[in-house]
């Protein structure tokens, strides 16, 4: 028996679609959830099934990545990222890391960033997993806001967006 360190990462999501006619931007796609499982005891000749989650196309969530199979104690699921908000939907979607909220088409509207679901997984997938929420678009009174929230990452929450400013006020990725 040997000890191995295992890194499992879900597929990243696609960003949301903006509206050229309304000069709004889609939210950033969330990163896939990340799991670092150090010191797993495994036999050298032990076969392990691994499924790699693909990245999402525009407005599509990333796929889940799995390591092992249930009911093994080292069965791990890294959730795919949540897709970025688009128009007219607005809100970013939940995932391993959440997608960012889209820029608004109307005055004072808000769009939430998607929540992270990685920590809600059972067993080591949640206990050892990391993911953060997407950033939101917080309104601000401009009919054409341009900006959008950044997708969440493995290191931080996605940046909040606000109208105006550099880069049209878009939030940074987490």
Specify the residue positions occupied by each region the protein language model found.
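Structured loops at beta-to-helix junctions and adjacent beta-edge loops in soluble globular domains
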Residues: 38, 81, 133-135
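GGW-centered surface loops in extracellular recognition modules
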Residues: 1-10
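Extracellular/periplasmic catalytic domains that process cell-envelope and extracellular macromolecules
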Residues: 1, 71, 123
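Short, well-ordered surface patches within globular domains
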Residues: 74, 78-84
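Glycine-rich (often Gly-Gly/Gly-Pro-rich) flexible segments and glycine-rich loop motifs
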Residues: 91-173
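Glycine-rich strand-loop-strand elements at beta-sheet edges
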Residues: 9-70, 84-90, 99, 164-165, ...
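Ser/Thr- (and often Asn-) enriched beta-sheet segments in non-cytosolic proteins
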Residues: 47-51, 77, 145
């Amino acid at each position: 028996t040997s000890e191995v360190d295992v890194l499992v990462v879900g597929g990243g999501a696609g960003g949301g679609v903006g509206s050229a006619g309304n000069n709004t931007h889609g939210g950033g796609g969330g990163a896939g959830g990340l799991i670092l499982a150090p010191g797993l005891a495994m036999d050298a000749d032990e076969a392990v099934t691994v499924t790699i989650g693909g990245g999402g196309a525009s407005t599509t969530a990333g796929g889940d990545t799995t390591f092992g199979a249930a009911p093994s104690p080292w069965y791990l699921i890294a959730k795919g990222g949540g897709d970025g908000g688009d128009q007219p939907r607005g809100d970013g979607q939940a995932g391993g890391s959440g997608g960012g909220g889209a820029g608004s088409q109307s005055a004072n509207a808000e769009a939430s960033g998607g929540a992270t679901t990685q920590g809600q997984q059972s067993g080591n997938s949640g206990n050892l997993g990391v993911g953060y929420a997407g950033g939101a678009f917080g309104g601000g009174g401009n009919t054409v806001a341009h900006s959008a929230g950044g997708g969440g990452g493995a290191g931080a929450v996605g940046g909040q967006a606000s109208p105006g400013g550099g880069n049209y006020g878009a939030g940074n990725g987490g």
